[in-house]
Amino acid sequence: MNVGIIGNGFVGNAVYQNVRDKVETKIYDVDKNRSLNTFDEVLQQELIFVCVPTPMKADGSCDLSILDKLFEDISNKNLEFLEERTFVIKSTIPIGTTKKLAEKYPLLWIVHNPEFLTARNAVNDLAKADRTVIGGDSTLTSRVAKLYWGYVYYGEDHNIIQCSSDESEAIKYFSNTFLAYKVAYFNKVYDVCEKLGMEYKNVRKGITTDPRIGKTHTQVPGIDKDRGFGGTCFPKDLNSLIHQMESHDINADMLTEVWLYNESIRKVIDWVIT
């Protein structure tokens, strides 16, 4: 087995660092300073991880232009050259995207394998992941599962969830949105404590000792010393899910309120809008 990686940001690098010593691995990025191999060299590998940005548009929707252009470029290659290559999208993408790409490019084998990483600790997060989700045709997802079981987790009793690509895309959005909601909720708890003269650390401890709730995502201010949530993931994923729900006439008021509250308490606007 050998692996190719397209995109050498924190996600692509996490994949690279976790497999490079176990299987032949090649990595390409549009930034030449981040590339160790050419685009064509990466496309010759059996499993090709796609780790490209999917930022937020001004209307909150997900910008798929980089991903779309990438697959257009891949499809223009000699198709025999791509025979039996499996493309593993790790980017966060709207529900239905993998299926649409597979229908548009029927000669390309495409699955979705969302990441659950923090930018600060991505390599270790992948090495110690509590689950791996792989969505798509079961024959293809099994190929990806083989890599994780055989070369990342060494046959450990690692939880690999194989499902449809729609489900894997949804799992990523609902996971991140829940955590964003949790951050906002505990910021509101902090507001109440400040208003009524209570010690937040005591209230927090009393709540988070319950194992059903847990302590993660409850520090206020956060590790970035700011209120609410920011960064590359939670803002864009929450807004994308709101946009997807509204486009299907599903009420998203609860999530919209979370976003409006976050904007009201967040000092640093550190998310990217295209």
Q: Can you say where each PLM-predicted feature lies in the sequence?
A:
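Rossmann-like NAD(P)(H) cofactor-binding subdomain of soluble oxidoreductases
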Residues: 47, 55-121
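NAD(P)-dependent Rossmann-like dehydrogenase/reductase catalytic/cofactor-binding core
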Residues: 2, 23-25, 42, 194-274
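Structural motif
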Residues: 47-51, 133
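Internal alpha-helical scaffold of NAD(P)-dependent oxidoreductase catalytic cores
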Residues: 102-113, 118-216, 244-251, 257, ...
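NAD(P)+-binding Rossmann beta1-loop-alpha1 motif at the extreme N-terminus of oxidoreductases
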Residues: 1-43, 47
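Gly/Ser/Thr-rich loops at beta-strand to alpha-helix junctions
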Residues: 11, 92-96, 179
